[in-house]
Amino acid sequence: MELLGRYINGNFKTTILSDGTKIRETEDDEFLPTFAENMDIKICNFCDMGCPFCHEGSTTDGKFGDILNEKFINTLHPYQEVALGGGDATSHPDLIPFLQKLKDRKVIVNMTVNQIHFEKKQELIRRLVDEKLIYGLGVSLVNPTEKFIELIKKYPNAVIHVINGVLKPSDVEALENNNLKMLILGYKHLRRGDDFYS
């Protein structure tokens, strides 16, 4: 397990390890940060999937955010964590230069992708992980095939996102006994997700 970094944020010291472990220490009774430890950033509203349950409402007409904005990037602190998503974050034309800027600032990046994009864009995903442009990878599960299970095992910091109400219990059972990390998320009644549920 590799040390990613240590930093002081307000009245506490934080240590972050390569497996995602985070240790916070303070001599006080409460943690009082001076800046956000992590943030979610939706970098685009473009996606070619059109999943009926998607709460993001992203479409093929969706726009790409101005992620190379230096004014924003310069507000980020070393070892601050950002979770990138979209739409399809992997489709953003400035993704690699943006991630390189964040890496240069020692910002720790996690990214969420749809299972279909994860499988189709393996060359890009592998590059992002191998070059340490991202550390954590969230993959929104669509169909737990054997191919998917074997593929995701190659990413030690991958977490499978299971959306309650979208998948069947048998889909979750298919993941059992594979030594995989799983996060069960609540269903969001927003945008297309609201129509799908009703």
Language model: regions and residue ranges:
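Canonical Radical SAM [4Fe-4S] cluster-binding loop centered on the CxxxCxxC motif
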Residues: 29-68
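N-terminal accessory interaction module
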Residues: 1-30
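Core AdoMet radical
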Residues: 38, 57-66, 78-92, 102-121, ...
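A general structural detector for well-ordered alpha-helical segments in enzyme core domains, enriched
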Residues: 68-75, 98, 124-128, 147-151, ...
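Basic phosphate/pyrophosphate-binding loop/patch that engages nucleotide-derived ligands
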Residues: 154-156, 176-177
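C-terminal capping segment of individual leucine-rich repeats
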Residues: 46-47, 75-78
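A C-terminal junction/extension of Radical SAM enzymes
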Residues: 1-6, 174-198
